[in-house]
């Protein structure tokens, strides 16, 4: 049997049989289970294709498994408080967790806590990275969505805390989900809220592109791979499909629930959504303790996978090459994660063996632009040419003097020769 190309990871609040279940979306067959505890809503993440991380529901630690050693916890990352949400950067270098109203950022290679972001006023509910790991997008119960430039966060001056690049405040009730499309710093971001709207934003400009109003609260959202459609899970158990390729007549518009644009099958609110890599299947989890696999074109449910409690996490991933091979091992060890900021009192010092390279902003004069550098270069060339010309003039003057002296000598010799010839002719 050929190895599957895609895998579905799902978790429920009960965690009686397993913390996380891995299964094949086409057949629904269970391939792996990870045991130990239960994971909080939006608290499940795959780190670098090597580790599975799950924020323990209601507890202040993160469970860590090697993808291959599913029956044994690798370690527990102790946190300052219960983990509300969790996300790993696509490049596998950073880990962020929402704890109360703060966002904690760790460096995976060293385990150092690099930053604590404190711009939200209430609990953080969802976190995600852009596909190039350059930005972090966070949503919270304070109805705010914040966009953080990762490298500006890492380069922040110690005299003041990190500040978000954008503060999107157009929602009026708690944020329930945040999803980012492809394109890195030029991607589009979809946000859903209990205010019955989903909003589409542009990271490059920070502008609101469109806002769609529903008749129910929206609890989850997902793009299809081509970003032609946006799938919105409602509190009534219905999934709504919004077309993004049609030009909106106005920036804020209502959603008209046509029969062919909805997925009906869940009996309770839809908590999480994910789309297959080829855009043909939609995976949904719900508080009705089921995960459904849908055919997007026909809007029909292909199968329903029962769970033991409300589904807290569901997402589909490209199958890691080492996930189904028990003999393989992670390519990098996971260090101990610090609870204190690097450089703070009580934090591990240099004797811990780690070296931090922090690229800070220059404190000296402002760096010149390319045009200013070009002007400076032109000025230097002009000075050089001026010096060369003055030196050349001096050389010409000196050479002229030498030639004048030689000419005088030649004239004297010519005069002497003329006088000598005249005397000879006169004597004859």
UniProtKB/Swiss-Prot annotation:
Function according to Swiss-Prot or TrEMBL: Functions as a component of the Five Friends of Methylated CHTOP (5FMC) complex; the 5FMC complex is recruited to ZNF148 by methylated CHTOP, leading to desumoylation of ZNF148 and subsequent transactivation of ZNF148 target genes. Component of the PELP1 complex involved in the nucleolar steps of 28S rRNA maturation and the subsequent nucleoplasmic transit of the pre-60S ribosomal subunit. May play a role during development.
PANTHER family attached to this UniProt entry: WD REPEAT-CONTAINING PROTEIN 18, WD-REPEAT PROTEIN 18
GO process terms (BP): DNA-templated DNA replication; rRNA processing
Source species of the chain: Xenopus laevis (African clawed frog)
GO cellular component: dynein axonemal particle; nuclear pre-replicative complex; nucleolus; rixosome complex
Record's keyword annotation contains Chloroplast: no
Keywords: Coiled coil, Cytoplasm, Developmental protein, Nucleus, Repeat, WD repeat
SMART domains: WD40
WD repeat spans: 36-75, 78-118, 119-158, 170-211, 213-252, 265-304
One Pfam family of this chain: WD40_alt
InterPro entries on file: G-protein_beta_WD-40_rep, WD40/YVTN_repeat-like_dom_sf, WD40_repeat_CS, WD40_repeat_dom_sf, WD40_rpt, WDR18/Ipi3/RID3, Wdr18_C_dom
Lineage, highest ranks first: Eukaryota, Metazoa, Chordata, Craniata, Vertebrata
Name of the protein in its database record: WD repeat-containing protein 18
Similarity comment text for this entry: Belongs to the WD repeat IPI3/WDR18 family.
Subcellular location(s) per record: Nucleus, Nucleolus; Nucleus, Nucleoplasm; Cytoplasm; Dynein axonemal particle
